[in-house]
Amino acid sequence: MAKQKKFSGKGSARSKRKQNRKQVGPRRRVEFKYKGFTLGELQEMPIKKFMEIVPARQRRSMKKGITPKQRKLVMKIKKARRLANRGKDPRTIRTHCRDFVITPEMIGLPFGIYNGKEFIEVKLVEEAIGRFLGEFAPSRKVVQHGSPGMGATRGSMFVPIK
C-alpha cells in the first residue's frame, strides 16, 4: 500500500479561503447603489442634482441641453412610464438617439436602439444608469476573417486545385 502524505496544514491561500467561506441559506442580493444613492433616491432626485453625480463626459452632454429628437424620446419615456405605473406592459420605445444619457426614470423600460441597420432590443437595468444608450447597441461587427482563398498568396498560385 502506498504511503499517504500527511496534511501539514499548509495549503494554498485559495483553499483556505474556500474553507473559511460559509454559506448559510440563499445568497441575498445586495441593494443597488449608484455613487452612494439607492434607486429610489435617484428616481426622486431632480435632474440638476443627478447631473452632478454622473461622470464628466455624460455631464457635459447633459449640460448642452436636449435636441428635438431627444425631447421626443423624453415624451415617449414619460408616456411609457405612465403605462408601467398603471400596471400595463409598455411597448418597446424605438429610438435613433444613441447619445442620450440613461437616467433613473428609464430603468425597467424596453428600448429598441438603432445600430445603423436594425433596432437592438434592450431592457435597461440599474447598472446602466449614467451610460449612453449607444453603448448597448454596437454599431460595428467584429470581423472574423476566414482562411485565404486560392490565389490569395503567391505560394498558393501554383498549387494544383484538387
Swiss-Prot record:
Domain of life assignment? Archaea
Keywords, A to Z, come to: Ribonucleoprotein, Ribosomal protein, RNA-binding, rRNA-binding
What Gene Ontology cellular-component terms does the record carry? cytosolic small ribosomal subunit
Protein name stated in the entry: Small ribosomal subunit protein uS19
The entry sums up its family as follows:
Belongs to the universal ribosomal protein uS19 family.
Question: What's a single GO BP term from this record?
Answer: translation
Q: Name one GO molecular function term.
A: structural constituent of ribosome
Quick one: where's region Disordered? 1-29
Compositional bias ranges of the Basic residues kind: 1-27
Q: Which organism is it from?
A: Methanococcus aeolicus (strain ATCC BAA-1280 / DSM 17508 / OCM 812 / Nankai-3)
Gene3D superfamilies per record? 30s Ribosomal Protein S19, Chain A
The UniProt function text for this chain reads:
Protein S19 forms a complex with S13 that binds strongly to the 16S ribosomal RNA.
Q: InterPro entries given for it?
A: Ribosomal_uS19, Ribosomal_uS19_CS, Ribosomal_uS19_euk/arc, Ribosomal_uS19_SF
